[in-house]
């Protein structure tokens, strides 16, 4: 009986340790395996309720907002959600209220080397805010991860404010 308890506690300890390692804070570079500072442009769209139209944008490297976004995303730490292990990125719904917003950012790169020796270009990292839920897509593995950040609501609002500002 005592041996069974030790085995069960050991299994529980390993599971807790694995969860802590999986959800540890990471930079976007650690998640996407590419240095976001090498990004050449940022494109995407945004929308604020009650508007039904999306506003698209393209920010070149010369645009101050592009460098603001790159710096903001490079400095932020992200925690992968355990829900990623249970459910692939399935659809979700949300009934928007006045003032709710969503955005989608594509970080576009020129030819970029990955740690495994391969090279790629184009949209290598994509970040999406769906009414408060942050999703990060990485091209190197083709996965979309739900992530959280510290002070997430303020972070998501700041990104929206930058991309929705008039040039």
Predicted regions and their residues:
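Function-determining sites in protein domains
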Residues: 3-167
């Amino acid at each position: 009986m005592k041996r069974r308890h030790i085995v069960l506690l050991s299994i529980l300890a390993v599971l807790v340790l694995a969860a802590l390692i999986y959800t540890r804070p990471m930079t976007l570079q650690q998640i996407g395996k590419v240095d976001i500072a090498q990004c050449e442009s940022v494109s995407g769209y945004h929308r604020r309720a009650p508007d039904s139209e999306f506003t698209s944008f393209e920010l070149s490297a010369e645009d101050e907002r592009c460098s603001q976004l790159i710096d903001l995303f490079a400095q932020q730490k992200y925690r992968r959600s355990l829900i990623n292990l249970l459910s692939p990125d399935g659809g979700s719904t949300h009934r928007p209220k006045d003032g709710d917003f969503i955005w989608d950012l594509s970080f576009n790169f020129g030819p970029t080397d990955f740690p495994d020796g391969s090279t790629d270009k184009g949209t290598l990292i994509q970040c999406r805010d769906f009414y408060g839920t942050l999703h990060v897509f990485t091209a190197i593995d083709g996965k979309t991860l739900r992530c959280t950040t510290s002070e997430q609501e303020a972070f998501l609002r700041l990104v929206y404010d930058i991309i929705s500002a008039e040039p």
